[in-house]
Amino acid sequence: MANSAQARKRARQATKARAHNASLRSRLRTAIKAVRKAIVGGDKAAAQAVFRTSMSTIDSVADKKIIHKNKAARHKSRLSAAVKAMAA
């Protein structure tokens, strides 16, 4: 239980930040799923278009430190490899 005014304010801020971070994390997951769905669908042009938009989302979430930059790079690398493998 937050007793001081400072602790009450920090509790309010933490709740707000947690909700915002959850929203960003959800956007990230949705973007990744969209690329995977396009890859499974087999339409290379659509997969590439979705891939480009999802890269922006992944980078922005990493810039805001919601996920580590290395995790973002790993996601981007694996999705890129999957999209490129569609041509082969």
From Swiss-Prot:
BP term (GO), one: translation
Disordered: region residues: 1-25
GO molecular function, one term: structural constituent of ribosome
Keywords for the protein's UniProt record, in alphabetical order: Ribonucleoprotein, Ribosomal protein, RNA-binding, rRNA-binding
Cystine connections: none
Pfam families (UniProt xref): Ribosomal_S20p
Residue ranges, compositional bias (Basic residues): 7-19
InterPro entries for this protein: Ribosomal_bS20, Ribosomal_bS20_sf
GO cellular component: cytosol; small ribosomal subunit
Family classification: Belongs to the bacterial ribosomal protein bS20 family.
NCBIfam families: S20 (TIGR00029)
Function, in words: Binds directly to 16S ribosomal RNA.
Protein's recorded name: Small ribosomal subunit protein bS20
Gene name per UniProt: rpsT
